[in-house]
Amino acid sequence: MTITPQEALQRTIEHREIFHDEMLHLMRLIMRGDMSPVMAAAIITGLRVKKETIGEIAAAATVMREFANHVEVQDNSNFVDIVGTGGDGSHTFNISTASMFIAAAAGAKVAKHGNRGVSSKSGSADVLDALGVNIDLQPDQVAASIAETGMGFMFAPNHHPAMKNIAAVRRELGVRTIFNILGPLTNPAGAPNQLMGVFHPDLVGIQVRVMQRLGAQHVLVVYGKDGMDEVSLGAATLVGELRDGKVHEYEIHPEDFGLQMVSNRTLKVENAEESRTMLLGALDNQPGVAREIVTLNAGTALYAANIAESIADGIQLAREAIASGKARAKVDELVRFTQQFKR
């Protein structure tokens, strides 16, 4: 039984759930551009007001994956995405992007899915661009990049063309909607493992259970209690972990790993150029908060990728990748590899 957009809107007004098959139908209408902008705006606002359920988010992510331009990766072992929802308002340098280079240097394969900054001063696409990486690759070129360098960056607009059908609505609404949390759930390379940062503590338990429904393998969803969508040095971090089909929720602290709790204030940047400088400083093994926080996040990603037995082991591997110069060398390797596809 399909549901009309009007019926769906009424359901959200009454704070009742839209069922899985109904949500699939509604999302397909939106992604095809077959729903009027007024109805699309009303429904996604209604969902936000009543609070989206795990089932609704999982169905929406399923459709977004259907409509994506996929990257076919042959070998799925130790394959991870490091991503944040963004929108945490912290304006820090690109910690997850720096972590990608370290994780790849330690043997993970990383499919990073990102965009230019919307809420942040520098999105992952902005800082990679500033580093000299060609971010505008076709899906087969991204697959080649992952196979060759252990890293691939998927520029969201190239992989989710159907999003243009809702872009104007989202821009005009100007508030967070379900689409703000779908990005990290819709990796076009289908990475089975993930380190996902979220902008609200409630999303830790929600997003990890959505990933469970979507068939992911090893996922850590994190929220720093100082408001960061990363594993934080400035506070405890809430973790939702999916492993072997089961979800566990717990808290970790920097001191658990022999790290000092320090404010993230010094990590703030104004633009992609400042982010680039801080990222390279951390990878060049310059002592400081930037190096420590990327070590912590890359270590967590290596645990998610099943290269490390624990976060603590991952941190040790991350330290070695930085100290040996391998992590810094990965930047030059990705620049060289992607520049050959410059159009």
From Swiss-Prot:
Q: What is its EC number?
A: 2.4.2.18
Which residues are noted in the entry as Mg(2+) 1-binding?
S96, E230
Keywords for the protein's UniProt record, in alphabetical order? Amino-acid biosynthesis, Aromatic amino acid biosynthesis, Glycosyltransferase, Magnesium, Metal-binding, Transferase, Tryptophan biosynthesis
What does the entry list as the binding residues for Mg(2+) 2? D229, E230
- GO MF annotation terms: anthranilate phosphoribosyltransferase activity; magnesium ion binding
- Which catalysed reactions does the entry list for this protein? N-(5-phospho-beta-D-ribosyl)anthranilate + diphosphate = 5-phospho-alpha-D-ribose 1-diphosphate + anthranilate
- Cofactor binding: number and manner: Binds 2 magnesium ions per monomer.
Positions with a binding annotation for anthranilate 1: G84, N115
Q: Which parts of the sequence bind anthranilate 2?
A: R170
Query: Coiled-coil segments, which residues?
Result: none
Pathway field: Amino-acid biosynthesis; L-tryptophan biosynthesis; L-tryptophan from chorismate: step 2/5
Listed cofactors: Mg(2+)
**InterPro entries, per database record:** Anthranilate_Pribosyl_Tfrase, Glycosyl_Trfase_fam3, Glycosyl_Trfase_fam3_N_dom, Glycosyl_Trfase_fam3_N_dom_sf, Nuc_phospho_transferase
Q: What does this protein do?
A: Catalyzes the transfer of the phosphoribosyl group of 5-phosphorylribose-1-pyrophosphate (PRPP) to anthranilate to yield N-(5'-phosphoribosyl)-anthranilate (PRA).
Protein name, as recorded: Anthranilate phosphoribosyltransferase
Q: Which organism does this record belong to?
A: Burkholderia ambifaria (strain ATCC BAA-244 / DSM 16087 / CCUG 44356 / LMG 19182 / AMMD) (Burkholderia cepacia (strain AMMD))
Q: What is the lineage of its organism?
A: Bacteria, Pseudomonadati, Pseudomonadota, Betaproteobacteria, Burkholderiales
